[in-house]
């Protein structure tokens, strides 16, 4: 039954993504070419970079893949399926801007291992020292379970809250760091295990490549990005197995 469910899910995703990709293609000639599409207030920032996973014990293994992320000002552009700016401020006990780093859904499919809410003080503009708190939303693969927790952006230690891999147990802590996003973007999580030590690290390293308010440009920039992330994760599961 599980195999049939998986096949049905894959077939549905393939059909939906194909149809929505065709619709996106039809929209391209009619995309607005205005100043608003290039940036301005509330523009979504676009980042390109790489995610790297490195496992040192019990057996060494490493892989990396290219990724694209969006940084969204939630006060100006609320997103369905995510915390509102007001909810994020309440959770983080902050009073300023809230910006969400995430891989947006593409052509009907969502695969987003990590989203980060950057919560600033009220006086914050773009200065690193005013980033007060972060909220992480982690989704495991293949189960699709989610967990959310706050952490200090410079560096923080949290008890491991979620089973994220069939090759890791639930022991230990996560050491997590998130620099304030600017022209460069960096997020890292290291696993501190009571017997294996610091045996696993995952890091996102990216650069700002543009910004836009145009929905078609956003859709084309992130076209099939969640699918590529999922393919990379499942391929590595096969290799490790």
Residue ranges and their predicted role:
Residues 1-241:
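Mature, function-bearing regions of proteins
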């Amino acid at each position: 039954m599980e195999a049939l469910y998986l096949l049905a899910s894959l077939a549905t995703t393939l059909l939906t993504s194909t149809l929505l990709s065709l619709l996106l293609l039809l929209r391209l000639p009619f995309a607005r070419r205005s100043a608003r599409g290039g940036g301005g207030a509330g523009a979504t920032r676009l980042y390109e970079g790489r995610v790297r996973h490195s496992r040192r014990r019990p057996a060494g293994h490493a892989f990396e893949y290219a990724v694209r992320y969006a940084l969204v000002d939630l006060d100006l552009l609320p997103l369905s399926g995510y915390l509102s700016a007001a909810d994020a401020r309440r959770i983080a006990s902050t009073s300023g801007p809230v910006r969400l780093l995430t891989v947006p859904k593409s052509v009907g499919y969502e695969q987003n291992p990590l989203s980060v809410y950057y919560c600033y003080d009220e006086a914050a503009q773009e200065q690193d020292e005013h980033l007060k708190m972060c909220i992480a939303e982690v989704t495991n693969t293949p189960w699709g379970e989610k967990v959310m927790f706050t952490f200090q952006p410079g560096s923080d230690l949290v008890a491991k809250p979620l089973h994220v891999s069939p090759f890791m147990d639930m022991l230990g802590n996560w050491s997590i760091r998130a620099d304030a996003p600017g022209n460069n973007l960096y997020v890292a999580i290291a696993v501190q295990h009571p017997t294996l030590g610091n045996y696993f690290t995952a890091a996102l390293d990216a650069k700002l490549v543009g910004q836009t308010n145009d929905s078609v440009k956003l859709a084309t920039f992130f076209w099939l990005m969640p699918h590529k992330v999922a393919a990379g994760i499942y391929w590595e599961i096969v290799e490790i197995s």
